[in-house]
């Protein structure tokens, strides 16, 4: 990690924002430290809710692994609004940390997983169909508070209803989605985009294996281990990702990074699971040159602000 005094040599200072559980960043993000230093950029990990931090002392504040925000979203968004050099910007964070953004993207023509939104206090009963469904809160990180239920199983039907009641009692909006079985064979494809001289540009893609094996177990870890492999994006996936990014409020030129998570729909065509603009793992360790491209994206944003 770089010391504060290095900035006196005129190096731009960059905060890489994390949480108390990962004070030295996620290992994948650490891969960008050497490329940043090689560009004369003094970067250091900083915990987002550390009251001692002077955010104005940084030339750029880059969200990376503040993965404890889901149960404190209002506090997190309020903090983001106090950091003028934040990327991605605070209004993007406010929009993207509530998954109801998916309804907006769907209305704009982006293919998404069909979703039922259950407001707190609403009376929800499992649908009559007997397929598998995923239940999760609209504000969540990773697979926390997320479960997969087979509605042909009476016990699962009751567990699903209890899951929704539990989230509702906590004042949380719930998402109910059909489980798309192609995930079991194809996994989820994440397409990573990083800022370049001409705006956001495709960098690389990875495949995430399925993680949801059954009902919500109340797992308390910050994030579950995933099986990750490098993957080449298909033209159809790239097209869907670009269509998704084209309808982001405020445009994509001000974004430093974006991750578009796709799975095959019932007809095999890609559908959007999530658009990650807040704190996505960027998986730079899975693609040649990706740590350098991330450092270059930071340098691009610094140059715009100088």
What are these regions (language model features)?
Residues 27, 147-149, 285-288:
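Short, solvent-exposed loop/turn segments at secondary-structure boundaries
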Residues 2-18, 80-84, 90-186, 235-238, ...:
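Active-site nucleotide/adenylate-binding loops and adjacent lid/helix of ATP-dependent enzymes
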Residues 235-306:
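ATP-dependent carboxylate activation and anion-phosphoryl transfer catalytic cores
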């Amino acid at each position: 990690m770089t010391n504060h005094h290095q900035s006196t040599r005129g190096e731009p200072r960059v905060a890489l924002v994390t949480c108390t559980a990962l004070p030295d960043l996620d290992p994948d993000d650490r891969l960008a430290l050497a490329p940043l230093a090689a560009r004369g950029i003094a970067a250091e990990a900083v915990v987002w809710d550390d009251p001692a931090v002077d955010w104005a002392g940084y030339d750029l504040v880059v969200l990376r692994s503040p993965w404890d925000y889901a149960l404190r979203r209002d506090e997190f968004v309020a903090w983001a609004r106090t950091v003028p050099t934040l990327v991605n910007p605070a209004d993007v964070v406010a929009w993207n940390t509530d998954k109801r953004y998916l309804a907006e993207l769907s209305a704009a023509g982006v293919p998404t997983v069909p979703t039922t939104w259950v407001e707190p206090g609403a009376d929800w009963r499992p649908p009559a169909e007997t397929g598998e469904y995923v239940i999760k809160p609209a504000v969540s990180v990773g697979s926390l508070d997320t479960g997969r239920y087979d509605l042909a199983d009476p016990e699962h039907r009751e567990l699903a209803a209890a899951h929704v009641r539990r989230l509702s009692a906590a004042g949380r909006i719930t998402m109910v989605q059909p489980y798309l079985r192609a995930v079991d064979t194809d996994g989820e494809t994440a397409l990573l985009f990083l800022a370049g001289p001409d705006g956001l540009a495709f960098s690389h893609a990875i495949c995430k294996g399925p993680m949801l094996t059954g009902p919500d177990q109340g797992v308390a870890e910050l994030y579950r281990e995933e099986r990750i492999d490098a993957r080449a994006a298909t033209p159809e996936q790239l097209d869907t990702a670009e269509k998704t990014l084209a309808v982001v409020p405020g445009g994509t030129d001000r974004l430093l990074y974006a991750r578009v998570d796709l799975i095959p729909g019932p007809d095999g065509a890609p559908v959007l699971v999530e658009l990650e603009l807040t704190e996505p793992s960027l998986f730079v360790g899975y693609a040649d040159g990706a740590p350098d491209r991330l450092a270059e994206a930071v340098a691009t944003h610094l140059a715009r602000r100088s």
